[in-house]
């Protein structure tokens, strides 16, 4: 048995595309998959493999990159932009709704960080919708509830991604 812990995002981008082929190719290996967006002590919980995004590691853990770096984008629906206009610069965002993300690990809301010619900007925006789930955030964007953040690979997984209009691409964080 191979015990794997990974975030939902890591499951969607890394494991899901390869799982069926792996199981067919190695029928004698049983996989136990734990999908959890919180912090997991891989050693204490006796996992064989953990997949997370970021660069914070527990002691005694070895990390290897599995993906190339990607950008976090801002997206809105055409209906939202028709009602509220398209922001052009960070100062415009104070007149828009942010679909926020709350960390499951510490209950903090992820600040909106943008990049302006190498300078990091923290932008305060009002928001009606906050979630700890990328599908809820994508649904909020899709339904015109505000401007939301999605990592580019998550945007690429959306079956109707043409409905997600990129906003202020020159300020996206890499």
Regions found by a protein language model. Name each.
Residues 1-62:
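Central regulatory/effector-binding core of bacterial HTH transcription factors
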Residues 44, 58-174:
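C-terminal regulatory
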